[in-house]
C-alpha cells in the first residue's frame, strides 16, 4: 500500500502551531498541533474531549458555520484536525484563535455532555480544556498565514 500523506510529515521536526495539512478539492485540513510529537507528553482525553465539544460548538455558531466540515482530535493526542471549505487561511486562523480564547475563559455547562448527546459523556475535563486552549492561544497569538506551512 502507498504511504498516506499524513505519514510523510516529519513529526520529529513539528513544533506547536497551526499548519495547512492538505487541500482536497475545496476542503482544507488544518493541523492544530498542541504538542511536539514524541517530545512532549500527550494531552489527556478528558481535556481533549471537552475542548472538542467547545471548539466545535463555537465554530458552528460563528459567521463561518456553513464553512465548517469537521473539528476533532488526532489519535496520537498531539493536536486536532480542523476542516473547512470556502474560507481563507487567515479567516481559519482567526476563527481558531477566537475559539481558543472562548474556551480558555469558558464558564458554565459544556454543550453536549449527557448520555443522550455524547458517546462518552463521563470523560470530560473543563479545567484541562481551558488550560490546553490558553496554552495554544499563546502559541498562536502572533501566528500568521506564513507560519502555517509545514
Functional labels for PLM-detected ranges:
Residues 1-29, 60-73, 77-81, 143-146:
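Non-catalytic beta-strand/loop surface segments
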Residues 27-60, 70-71:
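Active/ligand-binding-proximal structured segments within catalytic/core domains
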Residues 42-50, 92-104:
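Extended Gly/Ser/Thr-rich low-complexity repeat segments
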Residues 53-64, 98-101, 105:
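Short, intrinsically disordered, mixed-charge
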Residues 68-101:
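M16 family metallopeptidases and their MPP-like homologs
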Residues 104-121:
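Conserved short beta-strand edge segments in small beta-sheet-based binding/regulatory domains
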Residues 120-144:
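Short, low-order "capping/linker" segments at domain edges
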Residues 148-150:
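Sequence termini and other peripheral, non-core segments
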Amino acid at each position: 500500500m502507498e504511504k498516506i500523506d499524513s505519514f510523510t510529515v516529519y513529526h520529529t521536526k513539528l513544533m506547536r502551531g497551526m499548519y495547512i495539512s492538505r487541500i482536497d478539492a475545496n476542503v482544507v485540513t488544518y493541523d492544530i498541533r498542541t504538542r511536539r510529537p514524541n517530545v512532549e507528553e500527550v494531552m489527556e482525553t478528558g481535556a481533549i474531549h471537552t475542548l472538542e465539544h467547545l471548539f466545535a460548538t463555537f465554530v458552528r455558531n460563528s459567521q463561518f458555520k456553513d464553512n465548517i466540515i469537521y473539528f476533532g482530535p488526532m489519535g496520537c493526542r498531539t493536536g486536532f484536525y480542523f476542516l473547512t471549505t470556502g474560507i481563507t487561511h487567515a479567516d481559519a486562523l482567526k476563527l481558531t484563535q477566537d475559539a481558543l480564547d472562548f474556551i480558555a475563559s469558558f464558564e458554565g455547562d459544556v454543550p453536549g455532555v449527557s448520555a443522550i448527546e455524547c458517546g462518552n459523556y463521563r470523560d470530560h475535563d473543563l479545567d484541562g480544556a481551558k488550560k490546553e486552549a490558553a496554552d495554544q492561544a499563546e502559541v498562536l497569538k502572533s501566528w500568521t498565514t506564513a507560519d502555517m506551512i509545514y
